[in-house]
Structures are given as C-alpha cells and as structure tokens.
Amino acid sequence: MISPAKINLGLEIPFKRLDGFHEIRSVFLKISWGDDIEIEPASNGVFELFSNNEIILEKRKLYDQVSERGDIKNNILYKTFIKARSLFPELPGVKIHLTKRISPAGGLGGGSTNAASLLNFLFSWRPFFTSDEMFVLAAEIGSDVPFFLGEGHAFVTGKGEILEEIEVHHGQGILALTPQVMNTSEMYSLLKKPLQESASQKNGNTLSKNLISILKNGDWSSLQGRLWNDFEPVAFQLHPELGVLKDKFLEFGSSYCSLTGSGSSMYGLVQGLEIQEELLQRLRQEFSNLTFVRFNF
C-alpha cells in the first residue's frame, strides 16, 4: 500500500510557543505519490525492516544512515514500534517491506507517513489500541503523524495535532525533488518568531469562507497571495536557486507554486492533465539535473 507524501498549501508560523514548539497554520494535502509499504506480523515478536532506497541520489545516504543498513534505532518506524510495544506488550512483532522514495529533509512528511502506516497496522489488533490512544501516541512520535492517520486533507493548527478535515477539489500537480537539505530545527530558528502563549492568539485558527470556497472549487490561481509559506524567504536566501525554480514553475504554467514544509521540495498545482504534462516536460528540459514527478490529490 502507499504511504503518501503530503504538501502544504500555505504554512504560517505566527509565534513560538512556551513549550518550545512553533504554532503553525497550514492546509495539509495527501498526494498520490509516496512510499510503498507492506507490513505483516512477525511471530517471533521482533522488528524487521527490509527497504529499497529509491530516494534521489543526493539524499539517498540520509535514509541509509537510519535504515537496516545503518543505525536502525534512529529510524522512525523502529521508534514507533518500540514505543507502541512498551505501552502494549501484547502487540506482535512486525516485518516491514518498504520502498523509500520520499526524501528526508524535504518537507514531505516522509518519516511521519511511515509511522502512521505502522500505527494503523498495529491498530488492527484491537482491543490493544483505542483511536484516542493511537492519536496521543502519534502526536508523541511526531507533530505530522496524527494527520497521516486519517484519510482526508486537513486544516492543521497548534503544533500539528489540531486537525480540521476539509473538502478539497481533485487536482493535479508536479513535485520537484530537490537536493538541498533543510534542517527543520534550523529553519524554525532562522524565522526568529516571538515567544507567545498558545491561548493568547485565536485569530486565524479557522479558514476563511473565501478560502474554503477556493479549495472546494479548485481555483488554484486564486491561492496566490492568499496562502504563503513563511519559510520561503529564509529558504530562498540560503538557496537562491530555489527562488529561480519557483519562478520557472509559474512561468511554465503552474497556477500556484510553493515550497512545502520547511523545504526543500517544491510543487506546482495546475488546471488539468494537459497543462500538467506540458509543465513537466518544460521543467525537465530547463532543470535536467532535478527530478520531477506527477501527482494528483
């Protein structure tokens, strides 16, 4: 089954919370592209991972370092299994076959989506888990993990654990898998957001009626200027070539283009399959050193 990547439609970071996390506001979309993962119970009660690394060459080593070929104790799948097993010793062992395509340090939720896939598998052994217990455990593993437990898209606030499911029109896009490594913690620190109590700022914790309508109707060009990613100025200052890439996305036919997460992956949304194909070909011709993939949602 697919362990899907996500993209962010807008990512606002209004302030840093007293608990050390940053408050976020974003629309998270699951897309059709991602990792392939197969999980089965292991009778001996242990954790086994067998993975094929299909990540872009420049970032391939980042995954291998935490795979079964490196220090697996730093792998999010291993951490998820150990944490769940410590709470519920009755849980079986697992054998996981993973085809890894989602790059680390890309803003696509590659680790979080794998963790959620494993939690959903373990959840099938009821009554060991309730949905509330699984959600709490997911939030402890990673801020983006709760989103991947569900099936739909969501407006996400808090540190990533407050989810409001939303309706989004079917759409298509092109994803650029870029080689730049963006450390999430460093990117947040470069934003230099003020410290503020979570409860002190309520405005913006809901989507406007106008944005809800745009998302339902799929008018992606109307998102420009209404949804933005606060990390883009920092990312483009560190890596000006990402700003050039965004300009070309828009020049070549993308209706809306943005960095996803804290970077470095970038995507463009389009109005229809013909424009999607034309955009893909023009980007591949302009940036022959980069990897581009089609996706829909």
Curated annotation (Swiss-Prot):
Keywords associated with the record: ATP-binding, Isoprene biosynthesis, Kinase, Nucleotide-binding, Transferase
Catalytic activity: 4-CDP-2-C-methyl-D-erythritol + ATP = 4-CDP-2-C-methyl-D-erythritol 2-phosphate + ADP + H(+)
Pfam families cross-referenced by the UniProt entry: GHMP_kinases_C, GHMP_kinases_N
Pathway recorded for this protein: Isoprenoid biosynthesis; isopentenyl diphosphate biosynthesis via DXP pathway; isopentenyl diphosphate from 1-deoxy-D-xylulose 5-phosphate: step 3/6
EC numbers on record: 2.7.1.148
Keyword match ATP-binding: yes
Enzyme class name: transferase
GO biological process, one term: terpenoid biosynthetic process
Domain of life: Bacteria
Residue numbers annotated as active site: K6, D144
Gene3D superfamilies noted in UniProt: 3.30.230.10, GHMP kinase, C-terminal domain (3.30.70.890)
Disulfide bonding pattern of the chain: none
One GO MF term: 4-(cytidine 5'-diphospho)-2-C-methyl-D-erythritol kinase activity
Family listed: Belongs to the GHMP kinase family. IspE subfamily.
Role: Catalyzes the phosphorylation of the position 2 hydroxy group of 4-diphosphocytidyl-2C-methyl-D-erythritol.
PANTHER family on file: 4-DIPHOSPHOCYTIDYL-2-C-METHYL-D-ERYTHRITOL KINASE, CHLOROPLASTIC
HAMAP family reported for this sequence: IspE (MF_00061)
Protein name: 4-diphosphocytidyl-2-C-methyl-D-erythritol kinase
Gene symbol of the encoding locus: ispE
